[in-house]
């Protein structure tokens, strides 16, 4: 079951679902979603002259990105074909009986802005800011302003709560993240990690 605005408000008031700061609930809470705003931090992928990135090499992954912080009132220009990691302004905490889906806003989609490449899911138990995988599929640069509504979060109720939710017990590598996070895929078992 997808939560309606009334369901979302009830869960927020109960405190088991967290979206904060929720500065303007009348605007941000939609009929079946919550609009999330763009944060100030971005990780830009460098145009590197390297043959490839090896996902199991933390150094190669971290050397490939550079952090940019946009000051209040500033803009981040997303050029055609570019891919950057951004973050939501809000921090979320998803209870064990819900799953959250990150979706783009249709108004930005009509400007060819995509807010997630593949990671559109927040597992039960996830806590932290949400990293956005932003790309411009259009032919013109688009100015993104921190604080603008950039995405929406919908919530689906699970039939039963997760037995092993995302979090410390599972060693979840993105739990509690603040700001955009580069890939930590080198922590996966197939690359010698423990996850």
Curated annotation (Swiss-Prot):
Keywords: Hydrolase, Nucleotide metabolism, Nucleotide-binding. The active site is at residue 133. Belongs to the dCTP deaminase family. Homotrimer. Catalyzes the deamination of dCTP to dUTP. It catalyses: dCTP + H2O + H(+) = dUTP + NH4(+). The lineage of its organism: Archaea, Methanobacteriati, Methanobacteriota, Stenosarchaea group, Halobacteria. Residues 160-172, 186-195 have a biased composition (Basic and acidic residues). Residues 159-195 are annotated as: Disordered. Disulfide bonds: none annotated. Residues 174-184 have a biased composition (Polar residues). It is an enzyme of class 3 (hydrolase). It comes from Haloarcula marismortui (strain ATCC 43049 / DSM 3752 / JCM 8966 / VKM B-1809). This is dCTP deaminase.
């Amino acid at each position: 079951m997808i939560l309606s605005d009334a369901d979302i408000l009830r869960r927020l008031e109960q405190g088991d679902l967290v979206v904060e700061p929720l500065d303007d609930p009348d605007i941000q809470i939609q009929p079946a979603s919550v609009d999330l705003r763009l944060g100030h931090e971005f990780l830009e992928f460098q145009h590197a002259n390297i043959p490839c990135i090896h996902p199991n090499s933390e150094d190669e992954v971290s050397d490939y990105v550079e952090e940019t912080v946009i000051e209040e009132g500033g803009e981040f220009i997303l050029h055609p074909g570019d891919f950057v990691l951004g973050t939501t302004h809000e921090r979320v905490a998803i209870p064990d009986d819900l799953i959250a889906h990150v979706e783009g806003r249709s108004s930005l989609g009509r400007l060819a802005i995509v807010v997630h490449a593949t990671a559109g899911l927040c597992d039960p138990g996830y806590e932290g800011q949400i990293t956005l995988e932003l790309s411009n599929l259009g032919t013109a640069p688009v100015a993104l302003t921190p604080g603008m509504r950039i995405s929406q979060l919908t919530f689906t109720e699970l039939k039963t709560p997760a037995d092993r939710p995302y979090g410390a017990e599972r060693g979840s590598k993105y739990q509690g993240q603040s700001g955009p996070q580069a890939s930590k895929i080198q922590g996966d078992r197939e690359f010698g990690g423990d996850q």
